[in-house]
Regions:
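GNAT-family acyltransferases
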Residues: 1-96, 101-104, 117-121, 125, ...
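Glycine-rich acyl-CoA binding loop
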Residues: 107-112
């Protein structure tokens, strides 16, 4: 189940594809006919992906809520970024979204396109009423993405929580 925007194809990675991203990116690129140029899969980001991989493998039927979605530019099949829902919708019918973009692709509107499409899809599901996002207090670019997608500031502390 892929989503398409004006410039992007959003591909939610199946559990075995998420594992391939961690273990054999070249094989995944061949399978998806793409070239990965998004944020480097290392450090804290790699640990986050591995954590989501474990959950996705335990609950493959809910992979759309746990796996990462590749943001593939349609014109040349370059993966410019990734995004994910961090868990299944909770009892309040809320789900959190996270996202990251390769540095070379910042400030071109790709993430706004992707976040809007993913939020539209999520809100069309019967168990989702709201989408949450967390940004750093100085994460101006990320905050602008959320504002363009209709999010409003919900709580402010060490970080800022947003709600759609």
């Amino acid at each position: 189940m892929n989503l398409k925007t004006q410039r992007l194809e959003l591909i939610p990675l199946l559990p075995y594809q998420l594992r391939a991203w961690v273990e054999d990116r070249n094989a995944l690129e061949r399978e998806l006919d793409c070239t990965y140029q998004a944020e480097p899969l290392e450090g804290v980001f790699l640990e986050i992906v591995k954590g989501q991989l474990a959950i996705t493998e335990q609950h493959p039927e809910e992979y759309l809520w746990h796996s990462f979605w590749f943001l593939v530019r349609q014109s040349d099949r370059v993966v410019v970024g990734s995004a994910d829902f961090k868990d299944v919708p909770d009892a309040r019918q809320e789900v959190e979204i996270g996202y990251g973009l390769g540095k070379a692709f910042e400030h071109q509107g790709y993430m706004t396109e992707a976040v809007q499409a993913m939020c539209d899809w999520a809100l069309a599901q019967e168990n989702v009423a709201h989408i949450l996002a967390e940004t750093e207090r100085d994460g101006w670019a990320s905050q602008r993405i959320l504002q363009r997608c209709g999010f409003r500031e919900d709580k402010r502390g060490e970080t800022i929580w947003w709600k759609l």
